[in-house]
Amino acid sequence: MTVDNSFTMKKFQSMEIIYVTFSQITKLPYVECDPETFDDQVYMFTEEEAAKEFAKSYVEKNTPLLTVKVLRKQMPNFYMGLYAEGVNMVIFHEGDQTRRIELEQIFPKPDMEKMNKQHLPVLNPGVQLTVVYFLQELRKPNQRRDDAERMQHLRELEEEMLVNLMRSKFILAIDISQVQGEFDPANPGPDVRIPYIKNQNEDIFQPLFSDIGEFQKFRPDPQAKLRLAAIPFQHLLPYLMKQAKQNPHL
């Protein structure tokens, strides 16, 4: 059955604030797979208190949620983030009414072919979605280690995540500001540098990016001349710095 959401769309376009349910585990919008339609959906509210009450209802499910305010000027980037996360459906709560709205009805889906002229992964929704589902389940508090059904579910989520990782490309940043003449990717030479992050303990972390959006959040030396390379997951190892550590929050 087709639902006419035109009135709701007009309200969306005029709203100054929406409230969104986020996962405390991933710090991203909380995503659920609808058991009947298999839509990957998020929850939005017009009222902050309603969003908070919804979050409280998930406490008994051992699913810690929080309510995040999204301002009108933030909405385009927020909706792009939902596409990056693999979301296709919004459950919109307005007062005592609840509507299911396809994300494409709220914000147009980006033209991936047009955006991907450089063959860089503009979005990696398959990876992000399966990682989100895996982490949301893996880090649930108050779980029994001898729960065989849950462990089987975790193995299935992990397997799906790994399949998507193996199929994906990741963005590697290369600093060529010290290279003399033309840069040759096949013969990079000693003047090519790999950007890294060092914390207060002198630990080194090498940034890899799942998509362009994640790269844009990274702010290296503004004087650095960076070249982006799309590397298949199975070919990443030769590019990784030996002294780099794994992110302890993963």
Cite the ranges covered by each PLM segment.
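An interfacial alpha-helical scaffold signature
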Residues: 1-250
